[in-house]
Amino acid sequence: MNELELLGPRAYGDALGRAALKATAEDFQVDEVLDIPLSGDGEHLWLWVEKRGLNTEEAARRLARAAGVQLRTVSYAGLKDRQALTRQWFSIQLPGKADPDLSAAQDDTLQILKSTRHKRKLQRGAHAANGFTLRLTQLDADTDALNQRLEIIARQGIPNYFGTQRFGYQGGNLGEARDYAARKALPEQRAVRSRLLSTARSYLFNRVLAARVADGSWEKAQVGDLLAFTDSRSFFPAGVDECSDPRLAILDLHPTGPQWGEGHSPAGGATAELENAIANDESALREWLVRAGMEHERRILRLPIGRLTWHYPESDILQLEFVLPPGCFATVLVRELIDLVPVGQTDSPCVF
């Protein structure tokens, strides 16, 4: 499957040109933003780690080996890109133990920048945001047009698609999920099960969002929508009054789409009709998610791009800096600007 089939239409028209991303690790930098005051004592050793060309799971395995502990005692908030320069937190549970010598874990691809103790382990999804610095090289596009589109995006946000990274190479993860769903089976390995269930939910969400981008309603509240704030997992129904809430205009409040699980869509009106129609069209995937014990959740349809800035270090380089909530994809912003020329591996998760 191609990008259009896995995601959906762009919000702001055709790509404005072409560029390369991830020609080097420095072209895709991610800094995890953690809003947790660390106590300095406790049985959990917290590590601020810089990784280059190394995914989060391999870094965790390396830290576990160096510390002489089982992998399950190593925790992290989110998955970060392999083909990138990333900085993120890990924690290791060490009850009654001194800080281990972790030098064996470090080399050119992994450096421990600082460490401290805390009373609790690092939970998945505990980070507040991810900060990105992207360098688009070999840029072939009109900079005036790029600037105009970036200004619009800064004001209006972008569709909050799950990026192609979620679906694997050419959508292979989705094919696997469909196969398991058809057999009414679940993968035995926990990591594979989690990956494929996430793929199925993400695809159903993207189909709903694609339909609303196509009809222009992705950034507008309509009666029957379920609304949520940018950083909140809770939601509430939209009536006539809620559809004119001023917080919609300033990108604090957004319509949401389904993360399918048990039950029908809790939305109403045209929103529920669309969501249930897509779920019925993909009934095997939806029923598979229900049998797996997934609960119905919501995800904002519109993604505000926090602290977006850009400049051109050279005539053929565009550098972007911005902040996204956890679970949102930097490559979806790039997609609203340009087409990417193939450079290295790009199909790996950028955020959890």
Curated annotation (Swiss-Prot):
Keyword tRNA processing among record annotations: yes
E.C. designation(s): 5.4.99.27
Domain TRUD: 157-303
Molecular function in Gene Ontology: RNA binding; tRNA pseudouridine(13) synthase activity
A GO BP annotation: tRNA pseudouridine synthesis
Active site: D81
Record keyword tRNA processing present: yes
Secretion signal span: none
Alphabetical list of Pfam families matching this protein: TruD
Gene3D superfamilies for this protein: TruD, catalytic domain, TruD, insertion domain
Enzyme class: isomerase
Keyword set, alphabetical order: Isomerase, tRNA processing
GO cellular component: cytosol
Reaction(s) catalysed (UniProt annotation): uridine(13) in tRNA = pseudouridine(13) in tRNA
Function statement: Responsible for synthesis of pseudouridine from uracil-13 in transfer RNAs.
Family that this chain belongs to: Belongs to the pseudouridine synthase TruD family.
Protein name (Swiss-Prot/TrEMBL): tRNA pseudouridine synthase D
Organism this protein belongs to: Pseudomonas savastanoi pv. phaseolicola (strain 1448A / Race 6) (Pseudomonas syringae pv. phaseolicola (strain 1448A / Race 6))
Lineage: Bacteria, Pseudomonadati, Pseudomonadota, Gammaproteobacteria, Pseudomonadales
